[in-house]
Amino acid sequence: MTGGVRRRLPCLLCLVVLAGCGGGSDSVTVPKGFNLRTVEKPAFSVALPSAWRSFGDRSHTNAREVAGKNERLRTELETLARSDSPIKLVAFDPAAGRRFYTNMNVLQTQVPSKLSFDDMARTETTQISRASGVTDIRQQETRVPAGRTLRLTYRPRANAVVQQYFVRHGDLLYVLTYTTRESDAARYAKTFDRSAHTFQVG
């Protein structure tokens, strides 16, 4: 296992808790009821439900004002605001309630250029499955406009379900993490998947 992959795992699982290989660019059709959210540095875009609020590289927002009493969301927004933050986009569904927001984030990190997609997929799946509290992990390979993608679905703790997409693009790895309550997982599963399948780089 590479040091970069090992160091990234605690950050990925931390983002899940706080939140409550490269290919050519394909054309993207934005689903009805969604709109495209674009981040300029690094350059990528992803479609989200129109009602969702999102904050990216040009966000200058008061985290306390936006998050209210939701400590998890506030911490994530404060992390986003740091210049060295691996988080590049944070979004949430304001209709989900203030104690737990259904949410997503996009993390960008570098990976060794020699690390193949298959090796990356095995490493990420193994490391997350070994993490404390993670259960019911399911793995699937898919493809989004940005390239070949690993999709993992799992429960990081009681009353939460995560859908996570690992997109390799050159020597960069983009991780799209969608989190909701266990009781809402079936309702949001298609929304998360439709969103992830619009992700493109550049």
Which functions belong to the PLM regions below?
Residues 1-84, 96, 179-202:
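N-terminal targeting sequences that direct proteins away from the cytosol to non-cytosolic compartments
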Residues 30, 54-170, 174, 180-184:
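Conserved polar/disulfide-associated segments of primarily extracytoplasmic proteins
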